């Protein structure tokens, strides 16, 4: 993003625990950089035994409609919980599109695992 501090984008998948897969997102996510997140989300949706997908977005600096689409795709499986606190820019996008109203969100990864 022009004019903002660059944070290296990273998508980490934590080991599954009790049927919960945690995907940790760091950095900026747009159409050109969404590939690793798309792969991690697809693998989580397709994995046998994964009953909940926790998306940790606490370190997301920027997200565009591409990431929003990914969130909605997982949300439709009925297994998504977003771990926050949700960063301001992503929160704005979720509010603008009214996705936040239907998106289960927890304060941190451990709280999301427990839902």
What is the predicted role of each segment?
Residues 2-42, 59:
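STAS-typified acidic loop motif
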Residues 101-111:
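Short acidic-hydrophobic, aromatic-tinged amphipathic segments that line or gate anion-handling sites
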Residues 28, 86, 109-111:
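Short, solvent-exposed coil/turn elements at secondary-structure transition points
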């Amino acid at each position: 993003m022009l004019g903002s501090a660059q944070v290296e984008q990273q998508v980490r998948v934590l080991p599954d625990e009790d049927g919960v897969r945690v995907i940790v997102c760091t950095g900026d996510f747009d159409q050109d950089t969404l590939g690793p997140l798309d792969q991690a989300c697809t693998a989580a949706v397709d994995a046998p035994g994964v009953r909940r997908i926790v998306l940790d977005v606490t370190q997301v600096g920027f997200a565009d409609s591409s990431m929003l689409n990914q969130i909605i795709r997982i949300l439709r499986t009925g297994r998504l919980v977003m771990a926050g606190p949700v960063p301001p820019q992503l929160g704005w996008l979720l509010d603008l599109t009214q996705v936040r109203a239907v998106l289960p969100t927890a304060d941190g990864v451990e709280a999301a695992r427990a839902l």
